[in-house]
């Protein structure tokens, strides 16, 4: 009886390990599909900032998508392990007993494979290499905006800076440098063609993104400060009372120093990802987000 219980525990542990290995892989694939950006810097950042305003449907989507696939994949792997000797036409009892004996090792192997996949997917090796590598790029090329002399010879004018979430040049057709046969952003393409367009090529190429500039708040920080948004694993939590990149100097601070009143507007919760902290601390922005619009009855539902 004791031996039977030991065998049962062995199988349970092995099955759980295999399932966890599958869940790690499917969760990574789900994350790539849902959020598109797959960098360790982004994960570290979002672990340290407020997640207020996150749609709870995201967690449900993960559960519905990742868990069933992991169960099916894990079941197939378990079935394959116990029947591999039959598939290979090696009807040997010793092979069958050996598989059962080392079943937990098979589960551990699944975990190892899933971790290797995670290392490759998030380029963890590249991240570690960048962390330990010394560079003098900032000493050589960074210009401190707080020391720059700014003149308003033609008078001061309002500045409107628009961010389009999840809009990229690939939506244009190949004529404009996009990736589609049909141009899905014809008006934006024409605006870029007829006006100043910052691009890395002769078409609507946009800028070359580097690590720490790809997700929403990272893009805003990099465009306002000229630096990527990167946090150390050892850095403190970025809550409402934490200084947000205290050494940086942004466009908002330049404007504030020259008498401008800054305002940031968005259709979501500005606390998400530390967005409101960034704008409040770097330019003393008035924050107007979905919550404030709702509170002041300014949404389209209130009209």
Predicted segments with their positions:
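Transmembrane and membrane-interface helices of multi-pass
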Residues: 1-130
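Soluble catalytic regions of membrane-associated enzymes that act on cell-envelope
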Residues: 102, 121-303
